[in-house]
Design a protein with these regions (language model features):
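Active-site catalytic motif of lipid deacylating hydrolases and related acyltransferases
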Residues: 1-17
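Low-complexity, repetitive regions of proteins mediating host interaction that are extracellular
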Residues: 12, 36-37
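Structural motif
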Residues: 18-20, 47
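Active-site signature of alpha/beta-hydrolase-fold catalytic machinery across serine-
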Residues: 31-35
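Helical cap/lid subdomain of alpha/beta-hydrolase-fold lipid enzymes
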Residues: 37-213
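Gly/Ala-rich beta-loop-alpha elbow adjacent to hydrolase catalytic centers
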Residues: 20-25, 29
Length: 213
């Protein structure tokens, strides 16, 4: 991650920087802050999208598939989540409190959640995988319906509750003018690469980011 020249490498303090993180990148940064390896100075703005603060059931699913515990799985979902054997990155996203998440992982999640809530500036989550009209939209719809999510409110990969973990849910709004924006975008849409929807205010991630600047 590139930071400003005023940041302090000796203390790991990030100053005068705008951070945008998508998905697991925010969990990694939260864990680094919780472990004392990084500090977010008040002069820095941290913008986060689709953060799996409790993990993702996609990790549990791919581990079950690779362990032979799932039958009738869809090959395109496996391509989306990653192939067997499961790598360490995939395993590290096991959903908090489940059989694939160790006591140490559960504790690390809790610490990361506290660091996230205390330092993040603006957050984009999604309570629907309907998303924008793109070639991959059907794949994320399939993931949203097929994966064993705890809630139907998910972006295909990350549940709304996981993304908003540690933050008051009444602080979220479906207006792109809200710093805490609850959308109807799928997981890839929240990375901004597919632009904005035409009609719904709940599908305008780029406009949301512009309003933050």
């Amino acid at each position: 991650m590139q930071v400003s020249s005023s940041s302090d490498p000796a203390t790991g303090t990030i100053k005068d920087t705008i951070i945008f993180g998508h998905s697991m990148a925010n969990l990694i940064l939260s864990g680094s802050v919780a472990a004392g390896r990084a500090k977010i100075d008040p002069s820095t703005s941290w913008v986060a999208a689709s953060t799996p603060m409790e993990g993702s059931m996609g990790s549990n699913y791919i581990q079950e598939v690779c362990n032979g515990e799932q039958t009738g799985f869809v090959a395109t979902i496996i391509d989306l989540l990653g192939k067997c054997p499961v790598n360490s990155g995939q395993m590290s996203l096991a959903y908090q409190g489940t059989n694939f998440s160790s006591a140490g992982m559960n504790a690390a999640y809790a610490a990361a959640q506290a660091a996230y809530a205390s330092n993040v500036t603006a957050v984009l989550c999604s309570n629907s995988f309907s998303g924008l009209v793109t070639v991959k939209a059907a794949l994320y719809t399939l993931a949203g319906e097929l994966l064993p999510h705890h809630s139907s409110q998910n972006d295909g990969i990350v549940e709304y509750g996981s993304c908003a973990m540690g933050l008051p849910q009444d602080s979220f709004d479906n207006s792109y003018k809200s710093a805490r924006y609850v959308t109807e975008l799928n997981h890839v849409d929240t990375s901004f690469r597919n632009g904005d929807g035409v009609f719904s205010d709940a599908k305008k991630p780029v406009k949301w980011f512009e309003c933050l600047l």
